[in-house]
Amino acid sequence: MRSVEEIVELYNQRRIAAGPVHNQMRRVRELANGDVIVPLNELDKNAKASVANLLVQGLDQMSMRVSSTMPTPYFPPVKEGSERAKSSARQRRKAMLSIWDENKMQMKMRRRARHLLGYSQSAVVLKPNFRTLTPTWTVRNPLDTFAAPVDDPDNMLPDDCIFTFRASASYLIKTYGAEITDQLRMGKVNSDSRYTMLEYVDAESLQLIVLGAENNPGLNVAERAGLDALALEFVPNRTGMPLAVVANRITLDKPRGQFDGVMGMYYTRARLQALTEIAIERGIFPEEYLVARVGENPEILQLADGKNGQLGVVKGGDIQQLQLNPGYKTDTALDRLERQERLEGAIPAEFGGESGSNIRTGRRGDSVLSATVDYRVQEAQSTFEASLYEEDKIAIAIEKAYWGDVTKTFFIPSRSSVGQENYTPNKIWETDFHYVAYSAAGSDVNSLIIGLGQRLGTGLMSKESAREADPLITDPELEHDRIIAEGVESALLSSIQQQAVNPQGPYQPDDLAYLTSLVLEKDATLYDAVRRTDQRARDRQAAAMPQGAPETMPGLAMPGMGAEAPVQGPAGAPPLEALLAQLGA
């Protein structure tokens, strides 16, 4: 287990080593946030770039396409052919989906997609949440992530990782009290002073460390007193495995975001546009010079005022205007720079709701957009598949290590109802072997639905597989049961309608009226209403009524169709026992 001093030294080394990469990330962040300064003295100091920010457009569009569909965990049965193994596998899948839903994984994937494409890295740490008794995913900013170097670039599990964030002095004092003020070097402190926090994660422990203020010679003795770093929290890692997962974008040798190459072009385009605006402004408000005549001293006797019709009067000289016109190649240069940005960052015009001038048909537009976007989306989704696989294994290890024998409850998300099941982690997680896969990596939600429909039409895919792949269907098994129930209900309704139009059929007006009232007024289901109507008819037909009673009349129904109750027969001879009893009396 590393000491506080070793962790701080490790942080300083990694911060220096990651300096160039983090500087590039900060430039991407500044451009994405619009914090771009065009270095021209003629511009107002508060002026912003007045050109389209293609980086934001491309980053948002690509990230939304990557995260428009969610992957699905697949847990194969441990023993093939065993119904118990199949049931356990289904329960493991539902439990993992419930954990994802508890962590709002859909929203986290949207943020992680932006990190992966913009920063070339997506970092997440999993920790036990003792309030909800579930593993908790926390998405971390790649700018605040310092992972241990790995030999394999595809290895997403560093041996240890340091995450940083800033905390205010008021929060530290409120949370940790005298432990902070008595031991840490606080410097010139006020309630808004902020201190760097180090969150160290490895296979043995989770540690939280706060760094003291810089040892500035300008501080007095009391302000310089205290430790450089102080350990605040220590939690043993019972899982025995690293809890941080750092996914990197696939590049040649060093981290590089998808839009790193467009930044220089953007600055050039913004500067050229700014120069054009300056030239146009000077053309509207030209610079004027009072040129003296030979041997005369020029003087302006009266300033011109065009609004009031006042003429200007000049003595001893002439006023000349210096006209500046933008170059005729300026617009061509701006268009060329924009085109180069789109080519470099794979940002087609369709992202902005436009289309290239060489696109004549919708089919051609789809082909161009697919060639530009699909394979990049596929690669990003494949990266997330591998990352989520490792994250799920960590989540399973957390469940077994911290709540192995605790009976837990998970809820199966559904749009109409919520299913509830109980499980014990040590029993259900008999293995962590599984797959995480997108239904069709490289496809966004729109093209995925079209592809599923085409495969169903050609018979290449079963309806069950299509339901599992459709992102709009949260529970394929429940959807299958609903489809069967709707089909049977439709067949039952058709049967009732066909029998009702036949006057000699079993459904007579009174029975149909009773059936309709059960469905409309008492909110009974169709199958329950039919069952109750049938039982009512059976009871009526089994009860004999006296001759001439209203119940024996057919009413609106045809006679003999079962609408009337049977008539009681004539009384027969009394039984022998009754006669003997009378004689005995």
Whereabouts are the PLM-identified features?
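Structured, contiguous alpha/beta core segments that scaffold functional sites
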Residues: R2-S3, E9-I16, L117-Q121, K127-G327, ...
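Long, contiguous amphipathic alpha-helices that act as assembly "spine/axial" helices in icosahedral shell
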Residues: I16, P20, V51-L59, M64, ...
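Intrinsically disordered, low-complexity segments enriched in proline/serine/threonine
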Residues: N41, P73-K79, D144, D151, ...
